[in-house]
Amino acid sequence: MNASRIAAAGASTLTRRIIPCLDVTAGRVVKGVNFVNLTDAGDPVEIARRYNEQGADELTFLDITATSDGHDLILPIIEQVASQVFIPLTVGGGVRQVSDVQRLLNAGADKISINSAAVANPELVRAAADYHGSQCIVVAIDARRSSAEGEPARWEVFTHGGRKATGLDAVAWARRMAAYGAGEILLTSMDRDGTKSGFDLELTRAVSDAVPVPVIASGGVGNLQHLADGVTTGRASAVLAASIFHFGQHTVRECKQYMAERGIAVRLT
């Protein structure tokens, strides 16, 4: 791992992180609603450089069609980005075996996100964490609410870019993946993705309370208060957003200032 980039993220575990997410397909950053209806948002290297300059704590790159389409890892893009930004990079999409983790780390990633492959082979998470360390391994969970109104809340895990239902309970799955060695959980609400209606705070809080590792809240950010809510109500350690950054609604600095003014510890630059 790149020690200088990890150090740049801030040493305090109490500091809440703001993480722009770059969903990539065909070499471009895109953004959709509920995992469909994708809109082009720009060049990944240029966008990454902009967020680095704005003071983002980390960046997350997700190749959203690698698993469903079966194509190779986005190594050239990661190599370009890693050469130009100085904050931790988490990369996911198309990771199928431990050797893929090594290839992405060699390309410049600091952490590797595993989603569909973890469901297909949970031992992959354990093996990757044992070999590279839990600090390198993020398990991404795409969850959709499966309970009817009035029933106890439940969420189901989906894989393959939200295309395939698994029957797995999201909270139980997060707990299992933490036990297998995941150092973080990247939790996306499919119901809220791209809607700008705010995080599914009930889901975020349920998973945050269930696991002993940091949870990154994802899916639904439409304004600055949503980010703060993810930390205060959802109890997330970090908040991830895309649309509000990609299309110029807010800068990372504006988000951090807003959270700091409300007593949330963030790294200000």
Swiss-Prot record:
Catalytic activity as recorded in UniProt: 5-[(5-phospho-1-deoxy-D-ribulos-1-ylimino)methylamino]-1-(5-phospho-beta-D-ribosyl)imidazole-4-carboxamide + L-glutamine = D-erythro-1-(imidazol-4-yl)glycerol 3-phosphate + 5-amino-1-(5-phospho-beta-D-ribosyl)imidazole-4-carboxamide + L-glutamate + H(+)
The alphabetized UniProt keywords are:
Amino-acid biosynthesis, Cytoplasm, Histidine biosynthesis, Lyase
Task: Please cite one Gene Ontology biological process associated with this protein.
Answer: L-histidine biosynthetic process
The UniProt record lists the EC number as 4.3.2.10
- Leader sequence range is none
Instruction: Please name the catalytic residues of this protein.
Output: D23, D142
Q: Which SUPFAM superfamilies match?
A: Ribulose-phoshate binding barrel
Q: Record's Gene3D superfamilies?
A: Aldolase class I
Alphabetized InterPro entries for the sequence: Aldolase_TIM (IPR013785), His_biosynth (IPR006062), HisF (IPR004651), IGPS_HisA/HisF (IPR050064), RibuloseP-bd_barrel (IPR011060)
GO MF: imidazoleglycerol-phosphate synthase activity; lyase activity
Tree of life domain: Bacteria
What subcellular compartments does it reside in?
Answer: Cytoplasm
Per UniProt, the enzyme's principal EC class comes to: lyase
| A Gene Ontology cellular-component term | cytoplasm
Pathway, per record: Amino-acid biosynthesis; L-histidine biosynthesis; L-histidine from 5-phospho-alpha-D-ribose 1-diphosphate: step 5/9
Pfam families listed in its UniProt record: His_biosynth (PF00977)
The task this protein performs is described as:
IGPS catalyzes the conversion of PRFAR and glutamine to IGP, AICAR and glutamate. The HisF subunit catalyzes the cyclization activity that produces IGP and AICAR from PRFAR using the ammonia provided by the HisH subunit.
Concerning NCBIfam families, the annotation shows: hisF (TIGR00735)
The UniProt similarity line reads:
Belongs to the HisA/HisF family.
Q: How does it assemble?
A: Heterodimer of HisH and HisF.
Q: What is this protein called?
A: Imidazole glycerol phosphate synthase subunit HisF
